[in-house]
A protein has these predicted regions:
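Glycosyltransferase catalytic domains, chiefly GT-A lineage
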Residues: 1-279
């Protein structure tokens, strides 16, 4: 999806190898600028790893300048996300200027539930928001955990940072803490939420279409422009489509099977059967 955009000519594509096989590496060889083998940049117990080498990517993304040192700006895009509109990429690179973190909060028009709460009786309830739950299980100080309880969750699947941003160090500090007692998966996300909401790193929040998580809210399709758009007016074009958590049909994940398609509405409110993957 990046190479198809003419604006990408002066943009390097780099990949972290967190357990690819020889065939996968060979396929990528002539399509990207660099491939670097991910390491455990923070020591993690073998009991937590359990042979899942791909979990390195949860840690190594917080150390991107170490792996790819010759660049000044970094835009991380998860492998289950793709670029639909290059204007979004430009926004991310603009957002991270002056050391800021460019990132998107998981909130916007159409989101009906921001945090899970289990009501016991009367006014008494148990907070079960993703941030709060993960913070407690990672043994994060209760005062810090409470700051995260109802803060809009920040998805770490797409973000931008300059090479010399102070955010790297803050993020790495929090990642060491979350890895100490919590699970590896999701640790980097919790760490960035701590960095933003507790340490208050300088952040440029970008619109939801810059990291559109389709499993949270399906897009619409503009049949005339042949592109995915937000489902509510003014129907902005989706910048980066993110298939986090998968798009499932008949127990098959669209990320793993190119043939999976689902029904979504177009701008005339008629159903169309589409794949949410990037066209090849």
């Amino acid at each position: 999806s990046i190479k198809k955009k003419p604006e990408s000519n002066d943009t390097a594509i780099c990949v972290l190898d967190a357990g690819m096989n020889d065939s996968q590496r060979e396929q990528l060889k002539n399509k990207v600028d660099e491939v670097a083998k991910a390491e455990w940049d923070i020591e993690v117990s073998n009991l937590k790893v359990m042979g899942k080498e791909w979990l390195k990517s949860q840690v190594s993304r917080a150390f991107l300048p170490k792996y790819f040192p010759k660049y000044e700006k970094y835009l991380w895009i998860d492998c289950d996300a793709w670029v639909n509109d290059w204007k979004c990429v430009d926004l991310y690179f603009k957002a991270c200027e002056k050391g800021k973190l460019g990132i998107t909060q998981t909130m916007g028009p159409g989101y009906k539930i921001m945090s899970k709460v289990k009501w016991l009786f009367g006014k008494l309830a148990i907070v079960k928001s993703q941030n709060f739950k993960h913070a407690l299980s990672s043994n994060i100080d209760i005062s810090k955990s409470r700051k995260l309880a109802f803060a809009p969750h920040i998805n770490i699947g797409v973000f931008s940072l300059q090479k010399n941003s102070p955010c790297w160090e803050v993020w790495q500090k929090n990642l060491r803490q979350t890895l100490k007692n919590g699970k590896i998966f999701g640790s980097e996300g919790l760490a960035i939420n701590l960095s933003v909401y507790v340490d208050e790193v300088d952040t440029e929040f970008l619109p939801l279409n810059c990291n559109w998580i389709a499993s949270n809210l399906l897009p619409k399709y503009d049949s005339i422009q042949k592109t995915f758009v937000e489902p509510y007016l003014p129907n902005n074009k989706i910048g980066i489509m993110h298939l986090a958590a998968g798009i499932w049909k008949n127990n098959i994940d669209m990320r793993l099977d190119k043939n999976v398609k689902i029904d979504i509405y177009n701008l005339q409110d008629k159903k169309e059967t589409k794949s949410l993957r990037s066209e090849e």
